């Protein structure tokens, strides 16, 4: 506690310091003892001194704890409404000496033992608390569970209601909450307030190891991620190995027959369909087996041996990825899971904190409600289990299997082998015994996926929901955990009992497909009755927008791509059903052939185009020949596979069938707000990363009323044996009363895609920067690591960069728009090489020079200045005069890349994914060496390797993002050779090569969602990668349509980092109502490079771009983007690989980013902190700032106070600004520091008006106490009745009494004593603000509070009257009270009796001193000048109290 000045009674500090740390007193308050019996005029000393609190806080406020947020959720602080308004915020200690590696893991220890040891170590190293603030932003006290001496649960009455007295506080049982020892060391990451009681709160706790996941021992986490420094033969990107199968012509067991048009349903249009193959599956005499022509017989040989299948974790693959803990371990070990604790808090009471219930978020509660199909072995994605050929496509349980999505399986990849396939193994005939009821590897919720799901807690009614996090808590390179569902804790009406349940999104938001009714019952996710799709989300947040509850984020739906449960003759009858996505995708149309299972090469794509009966944008199926697809050659896409054999430990791309012949399914994007669900036919498999925007209004009443247990029927289960399962029919007319129908109204409105028209997307709608030219490094096909060879340096295809050089040929085409943001000048680059305007101008070409309206000399791609020619080589064209007219054989794709059709949903999807960097694309070249990509005629689509064809294969490669591919195929490590494809460049290993791997340059994953920002009552938005996405008028849409705007900043900087998401610090609403985002590159982490001790080969990968505000509107030659990656000499071939690596070393990158060295970081030279606002820095006196003599911008202040988004608005409280986030970020003050009266400073009124408590000798006790003391105030509101207020307070003439009130804090009927608190009304919000006071020596000092407060809570006095100045610095808690709107209240001075002090300089100086101490603002003023010349030499301010 603090040591007060001597003339203050020590006890009078007891409550004061417990209640205040940072804030300003805006008036005076008094606590008086009135004793009717003694009839004397003096008043006893009465400072509010709570007794020894039963719930004891070690320190009222621990000044070493600073604000922070968890990177997995949307929470920064909670605004509290109700009886004692204010807020809760998260605070933590900053320990730079944390060394988790000091906790050793013995080889005999399991993960749980190790995690417990880490947790114990962290207990002594870190402190976490929630901090209670009052309505002025003053910190009252910290609730630190770990330091509570005797925590107690609340006493309850007969009906279970908590016992509470406004003065004494909560009744306490003396008993600690349930499992206190397990939960007291956990970290609070979110707090919500109950809508039922202003004093009831819920805190979400997670173990410390979840926060430190990325820092755990690499034997635990890194090993799980298969990043090993020692074993060079191990390749983390490969996970478990597969062999390429080859055709087995000896197998002819399939019964194949042609179907003719006459066998098709007469009601179906046949003009667009070719003949399909009929496949029958016959059951043997035994119902659980198939006939001897069993499809499961091995139809494919393997390269190594005919029977061996290498799928187990053996031989050189010694490690399979495993989650940190299994579902059972989390459920059993309560200290290792998340917990929600209810607690009661009333800050102005004696016992002000008491605990309620403790609920552990048991992952099994979610798993129990998984659909039965998630627990049963599914067919492999060719439709049938096949033990011997299972490694063909690494299938185990459908597409959502442990090999592709190990985060959701308890054994990770360890079960992704042939040990427990669910049927007998070892039978030579491989007969099936039928399927086990439960798979050995059901979908579960182990550590990584579980903590991805913990976040965004909301209290609705008598329930608390955890809607899911954004996945960053446990996100690493080889894992992409996402939220899979919603947890709910349901309480009884008096919150005395509770129950936990969980629902997967698949059921909560899923509607059954019914082709007869256009199927989707207005729900976001279309599914089938087996719930074979596993939707997952990166949740941005769940917030109240206006009066609606909105969930927003990004979503992947995914599918299992299993064959339909129809015989093929039925399939033929129901082609429309097939096309509508009844469990069908590209792979579903694979026919059983002697070649194995594959799409028939002789079925034209047109066979699957739909007629008018189908969906407008149905799926289209491309040629898919297994001989090409799975037995690729080195000079085609085999380069993509073979390159995984290198040992670069950070190559974290998991290869999966990179095929030049892959079809690419798209979401049906729409700007409609209703009935445009994500149905299976638009989903690209169960991709890793989210690939659609998603926002929905939820029905909170239905959510609170749903049952704990979901009951599935027999219809939701697969048939019990394989033959029956293969022929299991779909329900074409599902019963409307199916057991999940009750969920149909959970979502009231949703959107799954943007209206891109007239958005900022239009600035590059027409040309995506993803067409690379022929070579990996400019025109050189052979990058080399030898110092003697020379290789030109690469450029990056990027947004506003990589625009086609021959752009003028396209700009005037019909329907093509090129809309730039104002004053925007992109550089004209291509992926082919560094673009120079001339030999002397090496900084790119301004857009103005290539616009069609410009008469200047057009850019000449044939000029030698615009080529990068290897020494001794011949120059080749590096730009493309025209994009291909067609990129696919289907009509819907014709404009998909040239983007002249604005309403093309595929185009929209392509565009978003290209912005997010999630589209690696293989494009096969066509033509000979003279016109490889220049063909402007229709390319043939049935050729794969020859010059006369160009069949682009659009393969989204399972949602992998370009950062991974850039790293894997980029310029890193020792295996840089001619066979490594380079992202965005031609993978040209030989003249016969025909594949180019192309990708966009904005390298974000769509998992990189920021926190949800409420912009107004109908709009909201969040940061997605480098873009801020605004959902405009979502709550009250205009004519049923939604406007989604994507806005970025104009200046770009490439950041090279392993974990780019660590740099994003959050978005908030600026004072002018504009959403802004905050970045801190100093928070970027890189994985250690253990293979080298020096910084030659950087360990950082180009993972994302950081946008910074462009403060110069004109085109700038010093563009930071150019400078960061600009080659040393762009026109010379002299620089080689070494130069590039040198250029990209961590040290150089840091220098480019302005991060500097450790010494310069201290004074924040550059600091590496980038904001989207100009920070208000205080380099001088406050009043100077208002005169614009310093960097405080008066206009900003004016805008703030004039705007409707004032600092008391609903949106601002702590949800926005991030101050000293992790100890490295400099203080960001987003609210103005001061506001003097009308911006002018002091008034010069000579008459002193006073508002003060009357001294005892002026109080009419005879009038006051003719009645019992309880008659003086309203027992319900505890406010002194209006008629008695003037008897206690001196009010100036003409003063509006309605602007103050007296709140009763304590009273005694026995002694006839009364304690009151004076509260002022904030004229802007009309809320009353309590003003605390520390009176110590009677009425004479009650009115001289200024020398009794700690220095840093002094108000400013400018002569007389007093002007109250509000300083707001903590947590962005928007503390300001612009009382100047109420002139009379402000001009009412305080009676200083016999003291006149000039406290202006003292107040300002000491306040700023304290702010500096508390927030670490390094550029705070060195000296504060006086605002008025009345006292040239200020008195030395008393020293603030020091800790004992």
Curated annotation (Swiss-Prot):
Ranges of Basic and acidic residues composition bias in the record: 240-257, 933-946
Bias type Low complexity, positions: 258-272
Signal peptide: 1-30
One BP annotation, GO: adhesion of symbiont to microvasculature
UniProt keyword annotations, A-Z: Cell membrane, Cytadherence, Membrane, Signal, Transmembrane, Transmembrane helix
GO cellular component: plasma membrane
Biased composition annotated in UniProt, kind: Polar residues: 851-860, 868-878
Membrane-crossing segments per the record: 1353-1373
Keyword Membrane: yes
UniProt feature, compositional bias: Pro residues: 1431-1444
Main location: membrane
Compartment annotation: Cell membrane
Family annotation (InterPro entries): Adhesin_P1, Adhesin_P1_C, P1_N
Membrane-topology annotation of the record: Single-pass type I membrane protein
Region of interest: Disordered: 231-283, 845-885, 927-949, 1419-1444
NCBIfam families in alphabetical order: termin_org_P1
Role according to the record: The protein is the major adhesin mediating the attachment of this mycoplasma to the ciliated epithelium.
Family, similarity comment: Belongs to the adhesin P1 family.
Protein's recorded name: Adhesin P1
Gene: mgpA
